[in-house]
């Protein structure tokens, strides 16, 4: 069977080496004669796996000791609710920066739970020369008392990524679902980081929360115990049965990334992949991208064909060439190539070759 390159935005492709290892030990993990899916999450074997996974994640992201690492149920949307329920209380206020579809969804969930009076939303995307660009606001000039400011580092639907560090007088809560471990960040700048697993960490059903100790101590009491970050921290993320197979695969992805040389190394590969694809788009009038260069996403490259009547043919021929899941999100249309950590450089090279040949054939 010829190689298939999966450009899905999420659930996304996993590293081939991780999938092969999971396949090999699916029925007999760690010499136990049973699958890792079948053992107790409180067994000494699984607890050892969980503890090592946290150690590896801390090393990969250089997470300071005064931060808690939580492995929680659900994806990024579940944390939209959890953040509000843990930190706003009855009278707290929060500021949400809106840069695209996902940050807007976070606003809507927060306003649904806390009410519009407690949630301020600030759009930070403008157009210049027909291109979307992000302008980070001067938050120190805003004379309000917020519990936190929330933003999303990468908008997977819109193809917009924020590379500049946010400077804030209030704790920063960041949705890193699609950029976590794709490039180096300074974790100490954040009060809380959350990320759904299904892009750069593992399969869906798991989310990672990295929360600073002082924020955890100031948290209000959510109505639901399974949403309570403090309870999760006090119980090693095992207050209730966790998604053990997703946790296991995340642990294997951490091992894989460490074996490559860590985030510093994969960041260079990711930059190379994105530059290669954007160069193909920019060098050919057959394709176009609508994002200013300084905010073009490295993880989710969105583009349109000059003649959108060819969209269906492009997708069909790409699939026959082993390049799948390139259809853009239904809200924006066009095409989208997701280049998460597991996407090899060879996959992007194959896509660029196909795009060049398709443009030549249909120009």
Swiss-Prot record:
Keywords from the named record: Amino-acid biosynthesis, Aminotransferase, Cytoplasm, Pyridoxal phosphate, Pyridoxine biosynthesis, Serine biosynthesis, Transferase
Binding note for cofactor: Binds 1 pyridoxal phosphate per subunit.
Recorded GO MF terms: O-phospho-L-serine:2-oxoglutarate aminotransferase activity; pyridoxal phosphate binding
EC assignment: 2.6.1.52
Leading EC class: transferase
Keyword Cell inner membrane on entry: no
Residue positions binding L-glutamate: 42
Cofactor: pyridoxal 5'-phosphate
BP terms from Gene Ontology: L-serine biosynthetic process; pyridoxine biosynthetic process
Residue numbers bearing the N6-(pyridoxal phosphate)lysine modification: 199
Reactions listed under catalytic activity: O-phospho-L-serine + 2-oxoglutarate = 3-phosphooxypyruvate + L-glutamate; 4-(phosphooxy)-L-threonine + 2-oxoglutarate = (R)-3-hydroxy-2-oxo-4-phosphooxybutanoate + L-glutamate
Compartments (UniProt record): Cytoplasm
Biochemical pathway: Amino-acid biosynthesis; L-serine biosynthesis; L-serine from 3-phospho-D-glycerate: step 2/3; Cofactor biosynthesis; pyridoxine 5'-phosphate biosynthesis; pyridoxine 5'-phosphate from D-erythrose 4-phosphate: step 3/5
Stretches of the chain forming a coiled coil according to its record: none
Residues that, per the record, bind pyridoxal 5'-phosphate: 76-77, 102, 156, 175, 198, 240-241
Gene3D superfamilies registered for this protein in UniProt: Aspartate Aminotransferase, domain 1, Type I PLP-dependent aspartate aminotransferase-like (Major domain)
Database matches in PROSITE patterns: AA_TRANSFER_CLASS_5
Record flagged with keyword Amino-acid biosynthesis: yes
Entry's Gene Ontology cellular component terms: cytoplasm
NCBIfam families tied to this protein: PRK05355.1, serC_1
Family according to the record: Belongs to the class-V pyridoxal-phosphate-dependent aminotransferase family. SerC subfamily.
The protein's assembly and partners: Homodimer.
HAMAP family associated with the record: SerC_aminotrans_5
Summary of the function given for this chain in its UniProt record: Catalyzes the reversible conversion of 3-phosphohydroxypyruvate to phosphoserine and of 3-hydroxy-2-oxo-4-phosphonooxybutanoate to phosphohydroxythreonine.
Name of the protein described by the UniProt record: Phosphoserine aminotransferase
Gene that produces this protein: serC
């Amino acid at each position: 069977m010829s190689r298939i390159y999966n450009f899905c935005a999420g659930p996304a492709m996993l590293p081939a080496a991780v999938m092969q290892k999971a396949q090999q030990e699916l029925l007999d993990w760690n010499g136990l004669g049973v699958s890792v899916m079948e053992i107790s999450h409180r067994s000494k074997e699984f607890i050892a796996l969980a503890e090592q996974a946290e150690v590896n994640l801390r090393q990969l992201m250089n997470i300071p000791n005064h931060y808690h690492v939580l492995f929680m149920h659900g994806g990024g949307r579940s944390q939209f609710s959890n953040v509000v329920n843990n930190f706003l209380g009855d009278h707290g206020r929060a500021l949400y920066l809106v840069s695209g579809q996902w940050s807007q969804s976070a606003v809507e969930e927060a306003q649904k739970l806390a009410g519009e009076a407690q949630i301020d939303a600030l759009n930070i995307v403008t157009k210049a020369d027909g291109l979307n660009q992000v302008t980070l606001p001067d938050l120190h000039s805003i004379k309000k008392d917020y519990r936190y400011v929330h933003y999303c580092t990468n908008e997977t639907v819109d193809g917009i990524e924020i590379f500049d560090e946010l400077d804030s007088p209030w704790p920063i809560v960041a949705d890193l679902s699609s950029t976590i471990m794709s490039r180096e960040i300074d974790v100490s700048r954040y009060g809380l980081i959350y990320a759904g697993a299904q892009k750069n960490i593992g399969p869906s059903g798991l989310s990672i929360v990295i929360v600073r100790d002082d924020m955890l101590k100031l948290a209000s009491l959510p109505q639901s115990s399974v949403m309570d970050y403090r309870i999760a921290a006090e119980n090693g993320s095992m207050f209730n049965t966790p998604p053990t197979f997703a946790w296991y695969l995340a642990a294997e992805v951490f091992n894989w990334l460490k074996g490559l040389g860590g985030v510093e190394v994969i960041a260079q590969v990711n930059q190379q992949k994105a530059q290669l694809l954007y160069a193909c788009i920019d060098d050919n009038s057959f394709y176009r991208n609508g994002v200013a260069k300084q905010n073009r996403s490295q993880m989710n490259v969105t583009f349109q064909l000059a003649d959108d009547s060819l969209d269906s043919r492009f997708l069909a021929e790409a699939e026959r060439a082993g390049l799948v899941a390139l259809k853009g999100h239904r809200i924006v249309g066009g095409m989208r190539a997701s280049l998460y950590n597991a996407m090899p450089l060879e996959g992007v090279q194959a896509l660029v070759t196909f795009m060049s040949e398709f443009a030549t054939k249909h120009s």
